[in-house]
Amino acid sequence: MPELPEVETIMRGISPFLEGATIKKIKLNRADLRWPFPENFASRVREAKVLNLKRRSKYILVDLSTGETLLIHLGMSGKILVSGSKIGNYFYESSKRSYHDHVIFELNDGTKITYNDPRRFGAMDLAKTNDVNNHKFLEKLGPEPLGNNFNTDYLKT
């Protein structure tokens, strides 16, 4: 299972490709991951501009221009692959789709962001950006270990 530092590294690695990009197409190669995708998932994400990425615990949060945030959890074996772009060292070349490529986002510049998860323990959901911290995945999480609220005063309580 990707631990918090790896999720942070993945989030930072895909940010240059996603931030400012528009999701032109989305292909769901199955109806669910660990849980079913939210209702109208593809149409709610399609044509949205990616405003920014952040991490909360082991979740990657993708703020969209639609006022919603895409929550991504990698589960035990999930990974995010970037293809069709020559920027950075994240280029992934494959002539055919892997059986475990469950979600493919195609961006306005032709870059493809592929969520691959052999065990399907990962998850994707959408939440209102202004209420994302009350989402069922996030509402009971403790303070962020890299944040200012995780300090000696918190540890004393």
Go through each PLM region and give its residues.
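Extended, highly charged segments
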Residues: M1-E68, S85-I87, E106, T111
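Phosphate/anion-contacting hairpin/loop surfaces
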Residues: L70-T157
